[in-house]
Amino acid sequence: MAHKKAGGSSRNGRDSAGRRLGVKLYGGQSAIAGNIIVRQRGTKFWPGEGVGIGKDHTIFATANGNVTFHKGLKGRTFISVLPAAEAAE
């Protein structure tokens, strides 16, 4: 009789779900205090005016206004939330 030996079990075939990281509000969009602007691992973006940073490096708005991205020292990208009248200038 023909027999097939037991096949070895594979050690692959698993993957974790995506973490939904990235920019949630882009430059020029309006933000309300408490809105999440960026979810990130580490400080790819740094907090500027009107913005706070969480323990997981999430950048969030602390004031109402428009989101702006700008370069700073050491090549860092800062995110600020400026009041609508100030951002228009």
Swiss-Prot record:
Tell me the protein family, please.
Belongs to the bacterial ribosomal protein bL27 family.
* The keyword Chaperone is annotated on this UniProt entry: no
Q: Which UniProt keywords apply?
A: Ribonucleoprotein, Ribosomal protein
Mind telling me what this protein is named?
Answer: Large ribosomal subunit protein bL27
What's one GO MF term for it?
A: structural constituent of ribosome
> Superkingdom of this entry's organism?
Bacteria
Gene that codes for this? rpmA
Ribonucleoprotein: is it a keyword of this entry? yes
**What NCBIfam families has UniProt attached to this entry?**
L27
Q: Which organism is it from?
A: Ruegeria sp. (strain TM1040)
Q: Please, one GO biological process term?
A: translation
A Pfam entry, by short name: Ribosomal_L27
An example GO CC term for this entry is:
cytosolic large ribosomal subunit
Entry-linked InterPro entries:
Ribosomal_bL27 (IPR001684), Ribosomal_bL27_CS (IPR018261)
